[in-house]
Amino acid sequence: MGFIIAIAKRFDALVGPGVMLLYPLYASFRAIESPTMLDDQQWLTYWIIYSLITIFELSVWRVLAWLPFWPYLKLLFCMWLVLPMFSGAAYIYSNFVRQYVKIGMNVGGGTNYTDEQRRVLQMMSLDARKSVQDYVDRFGWDSVEKAIKAAEKETRKH
């Protein structure tokens, strides 16, 4: 019985590193290799929030030492951020961060792209983005849309 109580008292220390570091590290590696940017947003946002929590803890550790529930609160919050069924970091990104950060703000320089066009450009690698931007500057966005439609039409044939 004493063993179970000891585990319950240190549950945060046993589970915390796996939830707060190991799984996010693994998922971040997978996100880097995936073609979509949605998981990149999830994990970049997670690491930013986790860093802010760590800075907060380091700044006020003397106060937090007096709060016995702090490690459990932190664990629950990080579980909410990490677990795929909640995707809390993605929620924070889409509902709070995105309001203050313009999507594709570094895309297109002074060119007036629509939000949809910026999203398309943002999903590309830097080299591809530069090539498409040069093409758009020379021929206009309509020619890019025509090329995309032609490629989609060609894909349907096969």
Curated annotation (Swiss-Prot):
Domain of life from the UniProt record: Eukaryota
InterPro entries in the cross-refs: TB2_DP1_HVA22
Pfam families attached to this UniProt entry: TB2_DP1_HVA22
Subcellular location(s) of the protein: Membrane
Transmembrane segments: 2-22, 41-61, 63-83
Keywords: Membrane, Transmembrane, Transmembrane helix
CC terms in the record's Gene Ontology section: membrane
Chief place where the protein resides: membrane
Bilayer disposition of the protein: Multi-pass membrane protein
DNA-binding among keywords: no
Keyword match Protein transport: no
Signal peptide feature range: none
Family that this chain belongs to: Belongs to the DP1 family.
Protein name: HVA22-like protein f
